[in-house]
Structures are given as C-alpha cells and as structure tokens.
From Swiss-Prot:
Pathway(s) of this molecule: Isoprenoid biosynthesis; dimethylallyl diphosphate biosynthesis; dimethylallyl diphosphate from (2E)-4-hydroxy-3-methylbutenyl diphosphate: step 1/1; Isoprenoid biosynthesis; isopentenyl diphosphate biosynthesis via DXP pathway; isopentenyl diphosphate from 1-deoxy-D-xylulose 5-phosphate: step 6/6
UniProt-recorded name of the protein: 4-hydroxy-3-methylbut-2-enyl diphosphate reductase
Cofactor notes: Binds 1 [4Fe-4S] cluster per subunit.
Organism: Gloeothece citriformis (strain PCC 7424) (Cyanothece sp. (strain PCC 7424))
Active site feature: E187 (proton donor)
EC class of the enzyme, as a word: oxidoreductase
Origin superkingdom: Bacteria
Encoding gene, per UniProt annotation: ispH
GO biological process per UniProt: dimethylallyl diphosphate biosynthetic process; isopentenyl diphosphate biosynthetic process, methylerythritol 4-phosphate pathway; terpenoid biosynthetic process
C-alpha cells in the first residue's frame, strides 16, 4: 500500500492529533512536579559529581528523559486532562519505564489487552481515545483505529518518524530496507510496516552473514531459517539483496549501526564497483541525536576511574541495555536496575546482567571510599535516579556507623 498517502490522509482527519490540545504548560507543570529532582539538578550544576561521606557519584553528562520521551509523556498527561471523562487507551507502553507507565494506569489510562501475543483492539469503541506511544504504531494498527473512528493522539517521536520516511524512500526506489534493530521491538515493528521489502539484522555478526551471502551466495533455506520472522513476506535473499538501503531502530548502539552501514556499503562497492554503487546502496542518517548524546556521554564516563557503574532504566529498554554494554565492554562492574526498589539497605541489589535473568548480588557496594558512575536511559525520570542515589548513600552511611 501507499503508506505515505495513508499517513497524509490520517493526519488530515479531525480525529487525529499530534500537537496536543493547548494545555502543554499545565501538563508539563504536573510532570515536572512528579519527575524532576533538585538533587540531580544540584549534581548537574556541580560538574556532574557529588561526594557524600565515602561515596563519590559521577553522573554521565547526558542521561535520562530525552525530548521525544518527555513530549510523549506530556502529551499523554495532556490527553487525560483534555478528555477527563472518556476512556483512554495506549496501544503499548508509552515509554519503557515502569514507574511512568504505572502513573498513567493510576490516571485511568488503560492498555490494549494482549491475548496470545495479539493485541485485542475489539475493546476500543468509537467514543474512545487511543494514544500511540513514542515508539509509534504499525500501519495496520493505525488503519484499524482510523476505521473505528476513535480519537487518535499520536506521540510518535519525530526521530522514529524520520526513519519511516527513510524506508519509504527505499520502497519507492525498489530498495530492500536493511533495518538494524530487534525485530520484536515496538519501534522496529512499526518501521518495518512502512517498508516494502525488508530484513532486520540484530548485530554485526548477522550483518556479516548477510554481506557474505551477497558476495558469495549460500544456502537460501539456511538464510531464511536464520532470520525467521525478521523479514518481509516473500523475501528472497537471492534477488532482494541486490539493492539495499540502511535504516535503524533509533535506540540501537550508534557505533554498531555505523559499522553495519559501512559494511553494507563496502560489500556493494566490492560487488558492483564504484561507478554503479549508487544504484545498489542508499546511505542513511537516522541515528537519533538523543541516543547518540547518551552513548557519547557514557563513553566519556567510562574513562573515569570508577569502582562500579549503575545503569538505570526499564529492563525492556533498548537504549538502556546499550549503555550497559558500553560499561561492560570497558571492564567496569555494572548493575542494570529499573528502580530504587531493586536495592535494599542490607547492601543487596537485584539487577539484570546483560542477556541474563534477574539475580541478587550481596555486598555489592565495596567497603571504604568508592566512586560510582551513574547513568540512566532515555525513559528514566530524574526522580528515579535520585531515589537510587539516596539508597546508595544510606547503605554506605549505615556501614560507616558500624
């Protein structure tokens, strides 16, 4: 289908809203009172460091709520204010942060139920309001909601929409979209729905496999089995990898996205030569500024002399996971938690090691003076970071008094 024409038609509908309802200041005031932190602002003003007792905190210089997340949450608050008596639904978590999503539930914003891995949109009625989250929604979902005639509030991050425009350009020129991302992630599901032919690659290892296939061929059935559920219907690696364009899930590791883009460019250059490269490869510029800033800040932070790192964000948050990867790659003991509730005052922490299930670590804060690096994902409010720091200070203070 012509997804570009559908988007244009949807945006002209009187039931579609993507710019709020004129109550932005009120919504932001409520948000600021709930999510901002005077302590975190104090640390920012003090060159991103604070020493209290035996603990020195080193904050990353870019962390926490990004503009797209702040916008999505503010629009959700504003929607509740503007429609105080109507039933409001979210098609997914508005962002990947448990406390923010719980706050919306407390405001009687409901989530579309999921039955056997499928969303049940039958619960939505014409008079209802449906919020599309920061990650966006698939074309199919938007069509369904538009057909129902309900009110649609679109909080999709503009950076995500920029990626949609890129894959639509690929489709228009008959290029296959190579999407660096997680094929099940809400954002990638939405992005792939705007693409024509596409293939989702998770990492450099998968990208190298694809590029080797482009140059040398291989077992098609093995290829299709390896990327099961990660390609468009009818995808054929023997014919659909002759012309490719690169796109990405905006929260992926910036350096890896760039490396994957260069790998595909070099692969097509090797196969088709410099004079014909532009007929087989489309370059890209879809790396989110906020993701890049947070990853760059983390790369600066790991250069400090740290005893350990605390990474705060939802366990299903892709951008938070990549911050954790950077810390581990640089040999720093790192703990990924989603809230201060994961820390108890007996010096235990329940955390999620990279690629593993939750586990509990006892005596995670060492004795004596320590320097703790701290960062948080783009969906984590400052107040959550403060709550984590207060737990750390309390544990070390109690130990010092023994």
């Amino acid at each position: 289908m012509d997804t570009k024409a559908f988007k244009r038609s949807l945006q002209q509908s009187e039931n579609y809203h993507r710019k709020g309802f004129g109550q932005e200041d009120e919504a932001m005031g409520v948000m600021n009172s709930e999510y901002q932190s005077s302590l975190i602002q104090e640390i920012r003003n003090n060159n991103y460091r604070l020493t209290q007792g035996d603990v020195t905190i080193r904050l990353a210089e870019a962390f926490g709520f990004c503009w797209g997340v702040e916008r999505a949450v503010a629009m959700s608050y504003e929607t509740r204010q503007h429609f105080p008596n109507q039933r409001i639904w979210l098609t997914n978590e508005v962002i990947h942060n448990p406390s923010v999503n719980q706050r919306l539930r407390d405001m009687k914003v409901e989530f579309i139920p999921v039955i056997e891995d499928q969303k049940d949109f039958s619960v939505v009625e014409r008079d209802d309001v449906v919020i599309l989250p920061a990650f966006g929604a698939s074309v199919t979902e938007m069509q369904l909601l538009n057909d129902k005639g309900c009110t649609i509030v679109d909080t999709t991050c503009p950076w995500v929409a920029k990626v949609w425009n890129s894959v639509e350009k690929h489709k228009k020129r008959n290029y296959t979209s190579i999407i660096h991302g997680k094929y099940k992630h809400e954002e990638t599901v939405a992005t792939s729905s705007f693409a024509g032919t596409y293939l989702v690659v998770l990492n450099m290892e998968q990208a190298k496999y694809v590029c080797n296939y482009i140059l040398n061929g291989g077992d098609k059935q093995e290829f299709l089995a390896k990327f099961k559920k990660a390609y468009s219907e009818g995808f054929d690696p023997d014919t659909d990898l002759e012309r490719v364009g690169i796109a990405n899930q905006t929260t992926m590791l910036k350096s890896e996205t760039e490396e994957i883009g260069k790998l595909f460019e070099h692969t097509m250059l090797k196969k088709y030569g410099p004079l014909d490269l532009n007929n087989h490869f489309m370059s890209f510029n879809t790396i989110c500024d906020a993701t890049q800033e947070r990853q760059d800040a983390m790369l600066d932070l790991v250069k400090e002399k740290l005893d350990l790192m605390v990474v705060i964000g939802g366990f299903n948050s892709s951008n938070t996971t990549h911050l954790q990867e950077i810390s581990i790659h640089h040999g720093i003991v790192s703990y990924h938690i989603d809230s201060a509730a994961r820390i108890d005052l007996n010096n235990h922490i329940e955390h999620k090691p990279l690629g593993k299930d939750l586990e509990v670590k006892e005596n995670w804060l060492p004795d004596g003076k320590i320097v703790v690096g701290v960062t948080s994902g783009a969906s984590t409010p400052d107040i959550v970071v403060e709550q984590v720091l207060q737990k750390i200070f309390a544990i070390k203070s109690a130990v010092a008094m023994v």
